[in-house]
């Protein structure tokens, strides 16, 4: 819960001034957004802040994803702003994306004056109603006296339990109204995690100790527990698989890592899971892209499911032990009760299945191919690099091939699968981590969704490198149509050729077309080493596929492809 500590100096604020004051009190250093008439009072107050830097995005969706990039890399709530009407509706996709991926955001929008709500005033939309299904919580502030509690509650809610976005819609007259406040809310803090029973921990430990073929299944909810996750895996010798959102929780080359499961996961991993007699599921929600046909997923396995969100327990698969709690808190009590076991027979079976179902990486040494490019880029940077992706084939190729070795290194749109995520998220990551290199893997379809944010990267001279795999197509759509639809490919290829090099140069980015370089690896190293933003372009054959692939509606063992 929020701290009960208070300060007792009476102060006079406009609503807008209080908002900025409160953000400063929360330690917010960067706010991103686009101003408009209904939020100009807040921007007027923000202009006087010596603590908060404003990043002017080129589109409100870009602002939302920039905020996500900041929040995903440090786990703290980040703030985005927009005006009413189109400003608010342009934010919707980025906020919905944050909701599905459990990202703590504070979204502040202006609204028409309270007396005009419901009159179809200029740039009026029902922001409160629109945002109900896509936020963890939302507010329409009708009176200035509500602001202190609303702001404090918003920050607490965004970061407590399962994190998520909170939307605060503030009419313009509330922003300009004046009030005096004597007792200012102290810094908002996370609410305490739910308590859990010792009996459930003992039951879970007994199941792990008795299991012959256990698998540790990690989802995005383990993001704050990397040390204990690894300790559990290593002590109990648990083969460990990860969802798309959990990649990096165990280093790619760790001997217990099975890599990613599911639709485009490691072929052997999907078969190994079918042999499991116990699944220890931490912070995962049994997403359909991860488990395939539900009734055929791990049919012989008992399930221990730990998640901070009660709604996820039993929603898709019924657990034998369900624990609603913070994963790190649970592991702190569980690990001492878990026996160290070699599990030699199980590891031999895992190794046999990995040999039977290998995971080849074609053209791994060719920097002008999909996998080869990813490997070549990885060779140019150290383990501190932050990786973002857009959504499509390039996303899956990167998930399969890039050596992800640490939490919060990998930023991708998992639940909503939003094209246009990668570049603004990379900008946010670079703003929050100015000493780290940020690599954004994108495709031509995705990059065009928020290409205008190249201007934001350029203006702020951020060390963001865009690696563009250009197949002049919507690659995953092209793949699914060619594989599973009788009429073949339709509306998935672009007839015109876009000169991305000229576009990037026009925004002020350095550029490199690897197809025109005599030594692509050397050219790649040289441009990645340069400070500032850059576009690296490679042409990819539109017929390239992401394999293996679980067909829509199929079981994970019904994979197709090489």
Which residue stretches match the model-derived regions?
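Glycine-rich, anion-gripping cofactor-binding loops and their flanking helix/strand elements
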Residues: 72, 220-304, 405-436, 449-451, ...
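Phosphate/pyrophosphate-binding active-site segments
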Residues: 2-10, 145, 181-183, 206, ...
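Aromatic-enriched
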Residues: 172-199, 346, 357
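Active-site diphosphate/adenylate-binding microenvironment
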Residues: 16-19, 24, 28, 37, ...
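Glycine-rich, acidic loop regions that bind phosphate or pyrophosphate groups
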Residues: 4, 109-150, 246-349
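Thiamine diphosphate
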Residues: 40-114, 116-123, 263, 268-278, 283-287, 313-316, 396-474, ...
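Structural signature of the thiamine diphosphate
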Residues: 29-30, 72-82, 88-109, 132-184, ...
